[in-house]
Every structure is written in C-alpha cells, then in structure tokens.
From Swiss-Prot:
GO terms for molecular function: DNA binding. PANTHER family: PTHR12532:SF11, TRANSLATIONAL ACTIVATOR OF CYTOCHROME C OXIDASE 1. InterPro entries: Integrase-like_N, TACO1_YebC-like_2nd/3rd_dom, TACO1_YebC_N, Transcrip_reg_TACO1-like, Transcrip_reg_TACO1-like_dom3, YebC-like. One of its GO terms (cellular component) is cytoplasm. This is Probable transcriptional regulatory protein RAF_ORF0717.
C-alpha cells in the first residue's frame, strides 16, 4: 500500500529482527495450512491458493521443513486447528482508511484486540464494507528493480495477463486482476524467479499525504501494533508519508 513500504523500511532498521521474522513465519504458516485445508487439493499444482502461499513463503525464506510440516498438519485429520478469514475496516486519525485482514482461531479475541488498537491510537473500527470502496482489490507482485528493465517486465506482464506495472528506484510492482493473479504469478516466477513479495491486497484509489511528523508517528504506531498480532495477515491504508516526514522519521534512532 502507499506509504507501507517506507514504513517497513523504517521498522526493518528499528525492530528486533528475530522476533519480527518469527511473526512473519507464523503468518505464512497459517496461510499455508488454511490454503491446504480449504482448497480442492493438497497438491499446489491443483490448488492455486496453496501454490501462491508457497511462493510467498519461499520469498521470505521460510525453511522447507516448516513448509512441509504445515502441509502435513493440514492433512492430519486429527488436527482440529481451523482459521477463519475476517476483514476489519475502520479509520485511523485524520480520515485515513484502514483495512485489516486476519486469519484467526478465535474471532472474539481478535475482534477485541483490533478494536482496542484502533481506539488506543485515536481511530475507530467500522463495519465491514465501510472503507473498502476506497481501494482496488487486486493481486500485487513485486520484484527488485534490477531483475530486468521496465520495458522487459512490462512485456512479460502483458504476456502473462497482468494489467499494470509501476517501477520506482528499487522495485517493479505488478498489478493483476484477482482471477489472473495465480496465472501471472506462476508465469513471472518461471521467468524471473521467486518475487520479493506477492499477495492479493487492497490498493488505495487515492492517497492522503501525511506531512506532519506527530500525525505520521501515531498512524505508523497503529499499523505496527496491528501487524504485531499473529492473527493479522496484512494491513492496508490509503496514506503516504511526505518525503520530508519520511526522512525525519527514518533518521530517528
């Protein structure tokens, strides 16, 4: 999401990386288990969601033994661990729309945690559907900028069936329709290897520029707290930090 990559860069420098990595692995494993359980097959060739989950796991270097364990767990009939997919929507301060996607084994616990986080940082949790009209629901695939030229990647995206690409100084970001996401991801993975990131998400139609340091820090803290939950898979918002505010926050110890 707009502003989100900058936030992740800031946290990469500040955060306790082992702890963060463990949480990322937990989220990936939940998606693998859910995909394997809910799909028509445990074979990724016949289960697009599982195939996509495995690609995402490999992009984050989730060890193969943990991937295999997650799939075996999903196949175990005695395993009663099931996760429910829920989308929470609300507003952060200053009218910033936030979408929170979760996989949870306890809906009441997660709802209370998400609501508490919104309230604590000056936001308000709304009904499902209250802000999603401000976003485009689509597939997102990201490669480092040096994987190929913008023209070459664009040609590959068109051939694969994607519908847009935006390239900046560091990243090629490819957008796809949801129904084409798995096909485009498989095509690009075959051509360029495992992407840096790939997911179906909510991309803002327009962004609100945050040009005040205090407002930015409060917003980023809300996003950080939400993302710290093992239940939360991803957080999306329609904001972007101004260059000045981003540089100030990035420079803080």
């Amino acid at each position: 999401m707009a502003g989100h990559s900058k936030f992740k860069n800031i946290q990469h420098r500040k955060g306790a990386q082992d702890k963060k990595r463990a949480k990322v692995f937990t989220k990936l494993i939940r998606e693998i288990v859910t995909a394997a359980k809910t799909g028509s097959s445990n074979n990724p060739e016949n289960n697009p969601r599982l195939r996509n989950a495995l690609t995402a796991a490999r992009s984050q270097n989730l060890p193969k033994e943990r991937i295999d364990k997650a799939i075996n767990s999903a196949n175990d009939s005695s395993n009663n661990e099931n996760y429910t997919e829920i989308r929470y929507e609300g507003y952060a301060p200053n009218g910033i729309a936030i979408i929170v996607e979760v996989l949870t084994d306890n809906k009441n616990r997660t709802a209370a945690e998400v609501r508490s986080s919104f309230t604590k940082y000056g936001g308000s949790l709304g009904e499902t559907g209250s802000v999603n009209y401000l976003f485009n629901h689509c597939g997102v695939i990201q490669y480092p900028i040096n994987i190929a030229s913008n023209e070459d990647v664009l040609e590959a995206v068109i051939e694969a069936g994607g519908h847009d690409i935006i390239s900046d100084d560091t990243t090629h970001t490819i957008y796809t329709d949801i129904e084409n996401f798995s096909k485009v991801l498989a095509f690009l993975t075959g051509k360029y290897g495992i992407p840096e990131d790939s997911y179906i998400g909510w991309i803002p139609l327009n962004t609100i520029i945050i040009d005040d340091k205090e407002k930015a820090e409060k917003l980023l803290k809300l996003v950080e707290v939400l993302e710290e939950s093992d239940d939360v898979q991803r957080v999306f918002g329609n904001y972007e930090l101004s260059d000045d505010v981003y540089e100030i926050i990035q420079g803080e110890p």
